[in-house]
Swiss-Prot record:
Isomerase found in the keyword field: no
Similarity-based family: Belongs to the Sp1 C2H2-type zinc-finger protein family.
Start and end residues, zinc fingers (C2H2-type): 195-224, 225-254, 255-282
Annotated source species: Pan troglodytes
Record protein name field: Krueppel-like factor 14
Amino acid sequence: MSAAVACLDYFAAECLVSMSAGAVVHRRPPDPEGAGGAAGSEVGAAPPESALPGPGPPGPASVPPLPQVPAPSPGAGGAAPHLLAASVWADLRGSSGEGSWENSGEAPRASSGFSDPIPCSVQTPCSELAPASGAAAVCAPESSSDAPAVPSAPAAPGAPAASGGFSGGALGAGPAPAADQVPRRRPVTPAAKRHQCPFPGCTKAYYKSSHLKSHQRTHTGERPFSCDWLDCDKKFTRSDELARHYRTHTGEKRFSCPLCPKQFSRSDHLTKHARRHPTYHPDMIEYRGRRRTPRIDPPLTSEVESSASGSGPGPAPSFTTCL
């Protein structure tokens, strides 16, 4: 039984070698007398020359018949995949209908999903094929250690790409991913002063139309905001000017100094006063009705050295000091 398995393996390897070389064509020897029917049923017998396609264009009647593959015996289960692969490749070679690659010594690309077959070692037995991966491995029998290795079939010129998205025989190599196309953002341009003053000789421009309207009142002399306090007939061009004036009547002082208890009715007065403090910082000034947290400056280097030497630090500056 092992001899039969080795014979079938050697026949499959010989078929692959002949197809890769492209110039060797197996022909059945003349049938001896009385052995016509028995020789035709030999395992792996090549089809007769009449079944091979001619040099002319193939027609419906010139299609070669499919090779008859006998059912493998239970003991030869390891050789059946090799015989089946050899028969399928022989069928593809016979049904191509063109003999250009036979004359040039080139073999067509395998259509098993890979561009190059993967040869196996001569010493390593290959009794199992991987149907899931579809890798076409050529394995030599163990008994024939002097059998030459099967060369890989080169790709035929002009042949289409192998199905399955594989290129160059790389396993699992899909099509190259497209470059990441990040949409470009429009560069942020600073807002332009679109609202120009229409009066001749005035080149002022503003970002908002409300600011332009209040500016135009300086040209027209219009003062729509009037004080409604008793015995006060003052008018203003802007609403914030009226609110500032109204505090003079009520005595409200909403701007308080962060360094002393003094308060002021106008923010510019508070800023002018706060600058007199040596520890003043602009972040201490009240901003839009909310006082920011005053920033405490770190102690001076001389004070740190005096505290390290044992002498106590000098008196801390009082926030209630008013200049």
